[in-house]
Amino acid sequence: MTAGASAFEQALDQLGAAIVGGELEAGAADTIEGFIARTGASRSVVREVTRVLGGLGMLSAGRRVGLRILPIDEWDLLDPRVIRWRLEGPDHARQLAELRSLRHAVEPAAAAAAAREIRDGRGSTRALDAAANSMVEAADGPESGAFLAADRAFHAEVLALSGNAMLGRLRAVIEEGLRHRATVERGEQAPDRHDLGLHQEVAAAIGAGDEARAAARMREIIERATAAR
């Protein structure tokens, strides 16, 4: 939970994590009053939280059954909040594996598509090159947040350059995985120099319109991140 979070954010995180963690089991019924007692939040806050959780497919509301917790196959598993709750809960290993598989399927293809777009005269790698260079600069600095911001910008730009709007919508999913890797898995460890070089190679391959090399280098980035876990 983020420091300084509002009462709404705290209650949402608490209930979302409870559903993901199985404290509130699929099929179980509850009430607004029960959620108020669990979170200590006001009725208006809890009502808003239940609307959000309903939108995420995590619970349903009905006059006779009250609030009912829904199973995981109903959840919006691509929402970054759901991803974060799963990464921070007992299901974290499964969520990491699913993120890894998603990145393997999506990012090399996005890098290849970006190279094709650039080769065909659509788009510019200026922002991508800047993000790759910022990663190198931030790796030497004291502020780890700057490195994460540059890393997120790099991967988001690859998706954007692909020319595929649907791939672009996966930006928040990829970013949540990068955030977890930077803040939880890597912790205080300095960024790997070889990985930094690979990011620059991806940018160079995209700029040169080399689909195969862009995909291969992006695949290597993901595989190295997986092996480091």
Located regions from the model:
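C-terminal all-alpha effector/ligand-binding and dimerization domain
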Residues: D129-V136, H155, G168-R229
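Hydrophobic side-chain positions on well-ordered alpha-helices
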Residues: A18, E137-G141, L159-L161, A205
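Hydrophobic, amphipathic alpha-helical faces that serve as interaction scaffolds
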Residues: L102-D120, A149-Q189
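Short loop-to-helix capping motifs
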Residues: I32, P142, G163-A165, G209-D210
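Short linear motifs at protein or domain termini
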Residues: M1-A105, A112, R116
